[in-house]
Curated annotation (Swiss-Prot):
Heterodimers with GPN1 or GPN2. Binds to RNA polymerase II (RNAPII). Small GTPase required for proper nuclear import of RNA polymerase II and III (RNAPII and RNAPIII). May act at an RNAP assembly step prior to nuclear import. InterPro entries: Gpn, Gpn3, P-loop_NTPase. This is GPN-loop GTPase 3. The record marks 72 as: Stabilizes the phosphate intermediate. The keyword Nucleotide-binding applies. The lineage of its organism: Eukaryota, Fungi, Dikarya, Ascomycota, Saccharomycotina.
Length: 274
């Protein structure tokens, strides 16, 4: 039987941990079990409970102090250490067979765009631990206010899709922050990115030298036709969480990974007709 895992990716501050917790909470409310695996050795203490935590193996702060490295160098060292000790991860995952594991990943995208750290871990999960994996890439909705920044984020999402070679779901998080600034009709244009959005952008006037570059990036995203977003509002719209989970279930074939359950025998109650 295959395990099911979800990777939460995206820049720092987009709400990955909040997303992970929202998915966990929703799954618990419908009677399903799931756990968060923290893969960020620099994670700050939070209200969210991690079932498996890379900081039990190695932490960024310890590496910075002992190896005299900066934050980025220490982060790479932590992941290289993890790759050399994947048996620790195997042991921690252990008997989690019929439960979701949600991997909360660091926000530094160079871990999969510049060095093959995350792709290596992904392949290990697939081949050695028999995981059906799905990647989710979060981009915060306020990016749509700065359209060139939005298309830059969409390009990063596409890069992750290509390099990780996983079923991929892109998510526009923190939708509640732009509800008073962007209409539903306009938002739909960002959920399925349209390069024509740049034509109405003030960026072309304030930064004319970047207009050509921004247009090239937008057209590249459009040419591949790979990037679409689902809206997410963890604070006020539980339906958006349920919708995203249904997409994850579909691409990971969750229902097919479940063992058939024995039918519950009906118990006939004795009735006294007298």
């Amino acid at each position: 039987m295959s395990r099911v895992g979800v990777l939460a990716l995206g820049p720092a501050g987009v709400g990955k941990s909040t997303f992970c917790n929202s998915i966990i909470t929703h799954m618990q409310s419908i009677g399903r079990r799931a756990h968060i695996v923290n893969l960020d050795p620099a994670a700050e203490p939070s209200e969210y409970e991690f079932t498996i935590d890379i900081r039990d193996l190695i932490s960024l702060q310890d590496v910075m102090e002992e190896m005299d490295l900066g934050p980025n160098g220490a982060l790479i060292y932590c992941f290289e250490f993890l790759m050399n000790n994947l048996d620790w991860l195997d042991e921690e995952i252990g008997d989690f067979n019929d439960e979701y594991l949600i991997f909360d990943c660091p926000g530094q995208i160079e871990l999969y765009t510049h060095i093959p750290v995350l792709p290596t871990i992904v392949r290990h999960l697939q081949t050695s631990l028999n995981f059906n994996l799905c990647a989710t890439y979060l981009l915060e909705a306020p990016f749509v206010i700065d359209r060139s920044k939005f298309f830059s984020g969409a390009l990063s999402a596409m890069s992750a899709m290509i390099l990780l070679e996983l079923p991929h779901i892109n998510i526009l998080s923190k939708i509640d922050l732009i509800k008073n600034e962007v209409s539903k009709k306009e938002l739909k244009k960002f959920l399925n990115p349209d390069p024509l959005l740049l034509n109405a952008s003030s960026d072309n006037e304030s930064n004319p030298k970047f207009a050509k570059l921004n247009k090239a990036i937008a057209n590249l995203v459009d040419d591949f036709g790979m990037v679409q977003f689902l809206p997410l509002d963890c604070n006020k719209d539980s339906d958006s969480v349920a919708t995203i989970l249904s997409y994850i279930d579909d691409v990971t074939q969750w229902s097919e990974s479940q063992e058939p359950k024995e039918p519950v025998e009906e118990i006939e109650e004795e009735v006294d007709f007298e």
